[in-house]
Structure formats: C-alpha cells, structure tokens
C-alpha cells in the first residue's frame, strides 16, 4: 500500500446475489503480488464462475472460500458457516482455532485465543439434506 507503506496480505472478494466477481483478473493480480485471495461466497452457494472451458463453484477459486448458513442465506442451519481451502496450513489453523485453540494434550492448554465455531448436530441435521438437494440440482444444470 503506497499510502501506509504496509504490505497487503489478502484481498477479500464478495460474490453478491449469486453473481460472481471477475476472478481471473483478481487471481492474476494476487498471484503476481503474492497476496492471498479470500472469497466471501455467502450469497453465491451453487453459483459457477465460467470462463471458456473453466467451470468452478464460487468459493473454490481463491485461497480460502467462506460460506454462511445464516437464516437469510441459500442454505440455512439457523447459523454457522463453512470455510473451504486446498491449503493444508490454512485448514490446520482453522481446525485448531475452531476447537478453542486447544492443544491436543490430555490437559487443557490453550496457546492462543480460540473460538467455539462448531455447529451443533441438530443444526447440521437441518442443513445437510438441503446441501444434498443443491448438489443434485447443480449436477443437472
């Protein structure tokens, strides 16, 4: 950033109302500048980004994809969400923080501030069948 002289770590792109952003251009800029691309796909679950022969779901093109299952979203569980990534380091860090940053020991040791981001089982029971229906519908389009 020229004004603050700080390095930009990530760009967050928001796909709104089922419309995909121009991901090819953003991904190219991010890759060139070694910046992570994070997709907020809360309002675009089931949307495809298409370019020539490429057809990929929004939320799966950047380094991290974020989805929401709040009551006003495409699939609802009454709350919660989903994070997707193919970066092993990011996935491990997300799992660690999700379980209150507790180390895998027999005693309780927290090495940093963690969160309780686990969705209760009844909420999963509400959302899971809907996800299966969405997958079947998406496969026919």
Short names for language-model regions:
Residues 2-12, 17-53, 87-89:
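Catalytic PLP-binding core of fold-type I/II PLP enzymes
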Residues 7, 60-61:
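Alpha-helix C-terminal capping/helix-to-coil transition sites in glycosyltransferase folds
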Residues 43-54, 61-141:
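Active-site region of PLP-dependent enzymes
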């Amino acid at each position: 950033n020229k004004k603050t002289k700080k390095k930009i770590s990530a760009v967050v792109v928001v796909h709104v109302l089922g419309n995909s952003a121009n991901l090819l251009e953003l991904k190219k800029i991010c890759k060139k500048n070694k910046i992570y691309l994070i997709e907020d796909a809360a309002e675009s679950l089931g949307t495809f980004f298409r370019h020539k022969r490429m057809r990929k779901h929004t939320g799966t093109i950047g380094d991290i994809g974020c989805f929401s299952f709040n009551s006003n979203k495409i699939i609802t569980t009454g709350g919660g969400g989903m994070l997707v990534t193919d970066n092993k380091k990011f996935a491990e860090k997300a799992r660690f923080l999700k379980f209150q940053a507790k180390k895998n020991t027999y005693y309780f040791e927290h090495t940093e501030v963690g969160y309780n981001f686990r969705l209760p089982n009844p909420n999963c029971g509400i959302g899971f069948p809907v996800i299966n229906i969405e997958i079947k519908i998406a496969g026919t389009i």
